[in-house]
Structures are given as C-alpha cells and as structure tokens.
C-alpha cells in the first residue's frame, strides 16, 4: 500500500514550472507548455479574469 508520506516526497525532484517568456513569472508548465499566469502557449491574448480584481473597482 503506497502512501503520500515522507518517503514519497523524495520522488518530487522534477521541475514543473519555469520562467515564462512573456510575463517573466515562474509559471510556465514545461510539460503542458502553458503559462498559468498569463496564458502563454494557450492564447494570444493575456489571461485575465474579472474575479482577479475587487468588484466595483
């Protein structure tokens, strides 16, 4: 039976996110080839949502 305890944490040594070419954030997923911050690799438009800012401001 495999658990998610201390021995399993030693397997987590691969780099998932690297620096994005467009926004510069460390959010570019190297396997998915998509930036989770700006949406680079998914869309030509910047990733932006209404819920990211306070409502009415």
Curated annotation (Swiss-Prot):
Free-text cofactor note: Binds 1 zinc ion per subunit.
GO cellular component: cytosolic large ribosomal subunit
Biased composition (Polar residues): 1-17
UniProt entry tagged with the keyword rRNA-binding: yes
InterPro entries: Ribosomal_eL37, Ribosomal_eL37/eL43, Ribosomal_eL37_CS, Ribosomal_zn-bd
Cofactor list: Zn(2+)
Pfam families linked: Ribosomal_L37e
Binding site for Zn(2+): 20, 23, 35, 38
Entry superkingdom: Archaea
GO molecular function, one term: structural constituent of ribosome
Zn finger (C4-type) location: 20-38
Keywords noted in UniProt: Metal-binding, Ribonucleoprotein, Ribosomal protein, RNA-binding, rRNA-binding, Zinc, Zinc-finger
Entry keyword Ligase: no
Any single biological process term in GO: translation
Disordered: annotated span: 1-26
Biological role: Binds to the 23S rRNA.
UniProt subunit comment: Part of the 50S ribosomal subunit. Interacts weakly with protein L4.
Family recorded in the similarity comment: Belongs to the eukaryotic ribosomal protein eL37 family.
The protein's name: Large ribosomal subunit protein eL37
Gene that produces this protein: rpl37e
